[in-house]
Amino acid sequence: MKAQISRRRFLATTATTAAALAVPRVLTAQKSEKQLVIGEGEHRYEVLHDWPQLPDKYRWQTTHNVAVDREGLLYVIHEGRENQKDHPSIFVFDGEGKFVRAFGNQFQGGGHGLEVRTEGKEQFLYVTGYQQLKNFAKLTLKGEPVWEKHAPMDSGVYPKDEDTKPTKRWGRDAFMPTNYAFLPDGGFFLADGYGSYRIHRYDKAGNWKSMFGEPGKGDGQFNTPHGVWIDNRPGREASVVVADRANKRLQWFTLEGKHIKTLDGFILPANIDSHKDVLLVPDLSARITLLGKDDKVITHLGEDPEWREQVLKDGMKLRGSRNGEGWVAGKFLHPHDACFDPAGNIYVAEWVHTGRITKLRKVA
């Protein structure tokens, strides 16, 4: 999560846009003796907060992103504390939520983006680091490094030494990568969501090729392009969709970076994933949006304006709760990322100090 978003700006952005997207109806959790269920119709989910459990020797340190491999293993990255270099930043769990392994100490203090990609018969992790790290890397699923790269100086966007002497410096000429989208040709897009507000394009070897976008509010311009995804849902030509977070919208582009359309009315859309016809958009302001094949809202999971007020109260005090005091079952605080697994279940990573990973088990 971007350290420089002020509390005042966060509160103002959220308060003025919470009602902008048409909401089918406010959803409340349905609780029985065995299940806590949210959603409606064909999109109902059992809520399993704190589903994966860490061994006692580890602690969540502000969870950021989640990804699932083809075997059903869940990968979680947290930001981590810069002064705890011996603590891993990436954690792996099996389909029952049991701990499998951990690695990635090198991302402590700046762990952010995380995606799994299949390349031929192999799978790899793609990771981004922000803050003082300012890097992005390709790893095996066991955490072995394949390559690591820094600011693309060929872009002409960044000052001297941004790639060789990274520091915790913010600004539109800084390199602060957030998330990936994988291209059909083996290349990928990399969103510089906290830095230059550009979307960089790389080839399959990780060589910089081009970029699109710039800071601003117009079509093709961004204000915190935090998430990026290849939208190849059935019946449509593949495009790249960007979660333009502080502009409160999604923007679609051709794979060459030409603007196609804009969908306004979100609060703080943080990232994107898809499953069949559904687009999944975790929103940093206490809800998760599902869009249908026509890009119209199916539902906002966890939507509750009164709860949102509580989440934002006293400078987002609930975010810092050390034991979950004040948190409500079936509600979210700050969904920073979410992803589907092949069965249509959803995993949610929240931007809270103690970290929280929730499994939404699909029941309909």
Give the label of every model feature segment.
Residues 1-17:
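N-terminal secretory signal peptides and thylakoid transit peptides that target proteins
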